[in-house]
């Protein structure tokens, strides 16, 4: 995570691409960015994500002490309800997209199915990240979201590619579904491959639900107790 005093690298996508290119494609970073003003404003209003990360993680470098003092983690029933509502809405979206991918059509679009499945996985990831971290990402790349989820869960392993070419191709199609649909208009993945991706997505969403339910039970005890 970077907290910076200016806006030049506010967009994590640009920064991550620059690092990737300047290291001859040897290093991939998955960065969370705040400007100094954003961070200080959030700390003022009791941001549990920043309070947790800045308190628990290792500080690699700090230029000065312009970042405000952290408060304590905020436990409150209303905080729990906010987390629970956020998860329920994300899970609702994930199930919606996943169910839409199963509709039988006379003229199916397998490229379109990958895009729908990508949306389903993204929504489940965004929900998990909020449940575990209370963080709302402003960047929605599938590899990025899966990597964030990997910091607290093994669920991304369901989606990550295995050694086979078919598995790696399926993962690539899920990650680049929007680009493929717009740019590779002549390419038509097989229906059997897209159905396998659909099955993986279903497994991922169900596993994410179990992880979220377990974490929500823990959070409920903490927030209601305090």
Show where each model-derived region lies:
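Short beta-strand-to-loop capping motifs
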Residues: 2-7
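Catalytic core of pol beta-like nucleotidyltransferases
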Residues: 9-226
């Amino acid at each position: 995570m970077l907290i910076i005093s200016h806006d030049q690298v506010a967009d994590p996508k640009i920064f991550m691409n620059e690092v990737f290119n300047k290291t001859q494609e040897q290093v991939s970073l998955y960065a969370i960015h705040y400007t100094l003003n954003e961070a200080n404003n959030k700390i003022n209003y009791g941001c549990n994500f920043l309070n947790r990360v800045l308190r628990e993680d290792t500080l690699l470098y700090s230029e000065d002490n312009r970042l405000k003092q952290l408060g304590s983690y905020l436990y409150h029933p209303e905080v729990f309800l906010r987390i629970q509502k956020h998860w329920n809405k994300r899970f609702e979206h994930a199930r919606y997209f996943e169910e839409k991918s199963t509709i039988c059509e006379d003229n199916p679009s397998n490229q379109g199915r990958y895009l729908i499945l990508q949306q389903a996985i993204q929504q489940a990831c965004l929900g998990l990240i909020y449940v575990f971290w209370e963080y709302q990402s402003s960047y929605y790349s599938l590899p990025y979201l899966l990597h964030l989820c990997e910091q607290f869960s093994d669920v991304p392993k369901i989606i990550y590619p295995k050694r086979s070419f078919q598995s790696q191709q399926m993962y690539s199609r899920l990650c680049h579904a929007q680009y493929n649909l717009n740019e590779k208009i002549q390419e038509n993945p097989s229906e059997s491959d897209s159905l396998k991706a659909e099955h993986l997505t279903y497994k991922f969403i169900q596993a994410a639900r179990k992880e979220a339910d377990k974490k929500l039970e823990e959070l409920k005890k903490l927030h209601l107790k305090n």
